[in-house]
A protein has these predicted regions:
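Hydrophobic beta-strand scaffold residues
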Residues: 5, 31, 126-128, 161
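Anion (oxyanion) recognition and catalysis
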Residues: 25, 113, 117-121, 154
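Conserved phosphate/ATP/ADP-binding segment of small-molecule kinases
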Residues: 133-231
Length: 280
């Protein structure tokens, strides 16, 4: 979208880390805030994570496997980043992070809270994608830990992103009319839950989620909704959307939504930007 954007993360200082940095630079993103960590050459001290994805076809769904063990970012601590410099001197206007990072380790929980609190100190807008992954939280305390951490984080969030499972597992809200396995979203119940969440967390300026109905691995129906100022706006429906690669669709939605909110302050337009960007 042409915005000045940087990434706050940590990489193992080796050839793989430099390759990752190169990919980020190709996207026009500033890498000067990356924390480079020394490594021993075989990953015992720290390493860079890997992701494997089977794209799927027809009735065979996409399957992802993330290898996050012992990664540099999971070992990063609050003192590894100068948040006063980032949000104070540099004047970053928006911070986006999420539950996958928070769940990486005990240190990650502390670091994301430190970042968010520093951002709020300097008036930076904070968005957070709950992105509940039970397998990740299981190693550091399970759903109880997920709720403890995310309920604290939620106090500082301006724009919260999450689906029905995210709000149920991470923040303890219930959606009326949903089945126990959350296989199908009761949209009316979800809208009611959003209003309850906004009452619990009056700091929420917007709450959003994508709407996806999987037809096959390569054909989905796609849309999104966004709550703001007591109203709920629904994006255009993308029926029968053909998909080459679904990985990152939610992140693309978030970036489009953020761009729309930053540049127009119009939630209806922003959720349409998000849905269109996610579709692309």
């Amino acid at each position: 979208f042409g915005m000045n954007t940087g990434v706050i993360t940590a990489f193992a200082d080796n050839e793989v880390g430099k390759l990752m940095e190169d990919f980020i630079l190709q996207g026009g993103v500033d890498t000067s805030l990356i924390k480079w960590m020394e490594t021993d050459g075989i990953g015992r001290v720290c390493r860079n994570g890997l992701n494997f994805t089977e794209r799927g076809f027809g009735i065979r769904g996409a399957v992802g496997c993330s290898d996050r063990a012992n990664t540099a970012i999971s070992k990063a601590k609050p003192e590894d980043f100068d948040f006063d410099y980032i949000f104070g001197e540099l004047g970053a206007r928006w911070l986006h992070t999420g539950g996958i990072y928070a769940a990486l380790s005990e240190q990650s929980c502390e670091t994301v809270l430190a970042a968010i609190k520093a951002a709020k100190k300097y008036g930076t807008i904070v968005s957070y994608d709950l992105n509940y992954r039970p397998s990740m939280w299981s190693a550091i305390g399970g759903i109880e830990k997920a709720q403890e951490v995310n309920k604290e984080i939620a106090k500082y969030v301006d724009v919260m992103i999450g689906n029905e499972e995210d709000f149920t597992a991470c923040l303890g809200f219930e959606i009326e009319g949903n089945d126990a396995n959350l296989k199908e979203l009761n949209l009316d119940g979800y809208k009611k839950m959003i209003n309850e969440a906004a009452k619990t967390y009056p700091n929420f300026k917007a709450v959003a989620t994508t709407l996806r109905e999987v037809k096959t691995a390569t054909v989905n129906d796609w849309s999104a909704i966004c709550w703001a100022d007591g109203e709920i706006f629904k994006a255009k429906d993308y029926k029968g959307l053909e998909i080459m690669d679904r990985v990152g669709g939610g992140d693309s939605f978030a970036s489009g939504l953020i761009y729309g909110l930053m540049t127009t302050e119009n939630a209806e337009l922003a959720v349409n930007y998000g849905a269109a960007h996610g579709a692309l």
